[in-house]
Amino acid sequence: MLVWQSILLFLVGCVLSKSPTNLYTPGYVQCPEGKLTRSSLDGINSNEKAYIDRRYANAKSELSRFLHNAKMVDFDVDGFLNSNPTIGLAFSGGGYRAMLAGAGELLALDSRATNPSVLSGILQSSSYIVGLSGGSWLVGSLASNDLIPVDQLLREDKLWDIQNSLVAYYGVNIVRNTAMWGNINLQVQTKQLAGFTVSITDVYGRALSHQLLTNFDNQGASFLWSDVTETTSFQNNEMPYPILAALGREPNTVLMNFNSTVFELTPYEVGSWDPSLRSFVDTKYIGTRLDDGAPVSKRCVNGFDNAGFFMGTSSSLFNIVLQQLNNMPIPPFLKELISKFTLDPVEKLNIDIAQYNPNPFHKSNNSDTKIAQSRTLYLADGGEDGQNVPLLPLIHRKVSAIFAFDQSADKNNWPDGSALIKTFERQFSSQGDGIAFPYVPDQNTFRNTNLTSKPTFFGCDAQNLTSLTENIYDVPVVIYLANRPFTYFSNISTFKLKYSDTERQGMISNGYDVASRLNGKLDNEWAACVGCAIIRREQERLGIEQTEQCKKCFENYCWDGTIYKGEPLGDNFSDEGLTTSAAYYNSNNVAGINDGGIALVKRDDLSN
């Protein structure tokens, strides 16, 4: 009986899978007509544009509902929405801290939540959702699983089992751990034997899938990132268009915010808007050998874009955790592959690189760049250049407003605005050609004037952006929400690799409180103020004056241009984010500080 059940499950998997092999190993299909690459100068991908147009019909009604519920005063919601304001959600890197805190923030935006917040409906109103590194685990796993609501995910308790690290996923069960790594060994080795280059990211991506793609047969071995377009939520235009961010990195080079090539991994295409590439390739056919975008034969590779591999690419900094396998009984092929990147002094510098061979952009129309000259495309963790909040994909799409959720570990594992600063600075480099990002202050100002302890809006007045661009109305209003403690000390180490269920829930609950401002308890106008930020750029474009309600909101939340020149005052995490004491947030009354959180430096202590 068990044999027939296994056969039936295999056949069902074949039907559901879009991979031609129903395995982790890619296969071959007939090539479509024409080139598989395109120039970024052509604008948004035609399939993406068609999806966003269909999506906006849904998003418009959801945004209308949100704005009505937000009690916008003296504002004609339905008349205004004919102007099509668009929203993008950006979730930062930061390991499981970023995934879990971001999950709570996303839950606060989701109208499907069991306990809706004052911001419920923002997710349904959004056109795009972007994640990098730990944020890619959030975006990638939810999109792959049909945009499952976070609270449903927790109730079902199948995904995001992170009670043990990836290295020993089954805890003390040595037999199951050995079987898991034996299976991963077989999958990666089979891919190599089929003629495809493999790297440590293949191993890491397959391990990561045990936590993020648990609902799929064989932990999503044959589930592709391009398969997201076949999910019910995508087919019904109910999902913000999902994007994962990574960076192009040549071996033995160091990435900076002014020289990196920011790659987008979307269900339709992969590539970059940056001058160092300005090309995209069809996601379905990555792995195909191309010459200036055209297949060199009639057979195209299909199945290379494994969803776990893509999430592993965006978070490849965590490849380093696999060095713990050197002392474990794993198959020789796997041991040799991992040892190459963890023990060899030269290769160890490149442990964070995912290899895409052949390079789809080889000999492309931008052939004078290093990327186009290389036979292998090397991609790395999306946050390695300091732009730890994936803003650029949304800037290129000229959205009206960006929610920037920052879980970075800049100072004592709290954000200090560095991610936004790096993106602001980039626009003045050659790689920043064609982008504009609103003014932001330095890190000292972010921390010491409370811009990380409560939400802050940037780019509030388009007329102040004229020195950055002529197209001032294409610059988004940025709604910045930094990780901070409310009900849990959420500044856990990026490299904390396992969380108990209590810790997991604590992180998610705190993220919910960060986004919702304790579900409106700290400001009963918070939802209205968010609404004011969403509509601001379109109001300016149309010449509509702000209401008195919105003017008051902007006085409370917009950065006013102040630059702090004094001595550091220490962290300030009072409820309001405005007082001079952190007395309410210490190990005696907030959970989590003994789970990896770092104690605060109190302002009142510094003044003594």
UniProtKB/Swiss-Prot annotation:
- GO cellular component terms? cytosol; endoplasmic reticulum; extracellular region; plasma membrane
EC class of the enzyme, as a word: hydrolase
* TM spans (from-to): none
Q: Which SMART domains is this protein grouped with?
A: PLAc
PLA2c domain residues: 30-564
Q: Which Gene3D superfamilies match?
A: Cytosolic phospholipase A2 catalytic domain
Family named by the database record:
Belongs to the lysophospholipase family.
Summarizing the function annotation, the protein's role is: Catalyzes the release of fatty acids from lysophospholipids. Phospholipase B may well contribute to pathogenicity by abetting the fungus in damaging and traversing host cell membranes, processes which likely increase the rapidity of disseminated infection.
Instruction: Quote the protein name from its UniProt record.
Output: Lysophospholipase 2
